[in-house]
C-alpha cells in the first residue's frame, strides 16, 4: 500500500511494543500516525523503534463535550482544546473529586494529574447517553460557582500548561464494544 501515514486506536501501539523486535519494523514509508491512546511511557521508544517522525494524538469521546488535538506535534500530549474544560483534583481511593472548604472543586497545578471535566455551555453542550440516569451520574454541578455544570469524562490527564494535556489513565470503562462502554 506504500502509505506514509496511518491511524491507531487504544492499546495497539503498546501491543506492538510488547511484540518481539522484527527486521520489518522500519521497512515502510510511514512517518506520521494519528490516533488516540498512545501511552506517554512508550511514546519516545515507539517513535524510535518504528521510525515514526510525528504522532498526532487526539482525545475525544462520542458522548463528551471536550476534545483535544495535537496539531503542533508536542510529544507525549493529546494536544490542546479550544473548548472550556478543567482538570481537577481527584481522590482515587474515594473515586470522587476533591472539594475545598466551600464545596467547590480544586484545579490541579501545571504538571499535576487530575480528572478531566468539560464545561457544559450552549456552545459546548453535553449530548450524553440514551439513559437519563447515566447522564445524571456524569454531570457535576456547582463545580466552581453556583449553577455551573461539567461533564465528568472519567479520564485522568496531566496539565501540561498552555491548555495542553497528557492522557494518563481511564478510571472506569476499560474498552468500547459496539459503541458502548464496557
Per-range role (PLM):
Residues 10, 61, 87, 92, ...:
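Intrinsically disordered, low-complexity regions enriched in small/polar residues
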Residues 13:
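Aromatic/His-enriched, Gly/Pro-containing loop or helix-boundary segments
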Residues 20-24, 93-101, 142-145:
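Alpha-helix termini
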Residues 104-181:
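Conserved ATP-binding/catalytic segment of the ANL
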Residues 1-9, 17-90, 105, 125-126:
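Gly/Ser/Thr-rich phosphate-binding loop
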Residues 37, 181-182:
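Conserved phosphate-coordination/catalytic loops
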Residues 40, 70-71, 100, 139-142, ...:
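Short secondary-structure boundary micro-motifs
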Residues 77-99, 127-130, 134-140:
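Mobile, glycine-enriched helix-loop/loop "lid" segments at the mouths of ligand-binding/catalytic clefts
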Amino acid at each position: 500500500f506504500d502509505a506514509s501515514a496511518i491511524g491507531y486506536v487504544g492499546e495497539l501501539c503498546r501491543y506492538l511494543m510488547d511484540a518481539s523486535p522484527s527486521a520489518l519494523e522500519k521497512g515502510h514509508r510511514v512517518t506520521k500516525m494519528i490516533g488516540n491512546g498512545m501511552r506517554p511511557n512508550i511514546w519516545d521508544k515507539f517513535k524510535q523503534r518504528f521510525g515514526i517522525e510525528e504522532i498526532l494524538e487526539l482525545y475525544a469521546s462520542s458522548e463528551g463535550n471536550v476534545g483535544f488535538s495535537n496539531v503542533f506535534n508536542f510529544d507525549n500530549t493529546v494536544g490542546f482544546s479550544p473548548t472550556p474544560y478543567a482538570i481537577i483534583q481527584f481522590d482515587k481511593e474515594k473515586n470522587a473529586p476533591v472539594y475545598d472548604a466551600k464545596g467547590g472543586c480544586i484545579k490541579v497545578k501545571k504538571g499535576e494529574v487530575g480528572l478531566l471535566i468539560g464545561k457544559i455551555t450552549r456552545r459546548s453542550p453535553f449530548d450524553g447517553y440514551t439513559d437519563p440516569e447515566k447522564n445524571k451520574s456524569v454531570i457535576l454541578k456547582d463545580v466552581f460557582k453556583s449553577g455551573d455544570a461539567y461533564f465528568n469524562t472519567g479520564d485522568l490527564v496531566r496539565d501540561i500548561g498552555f491548555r495542553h494535556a497528557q492522557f494518563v489513565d481511564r478510571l472506569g470503562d476499560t474498552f468500547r464494544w459496539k459503541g458502548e462502554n464496557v
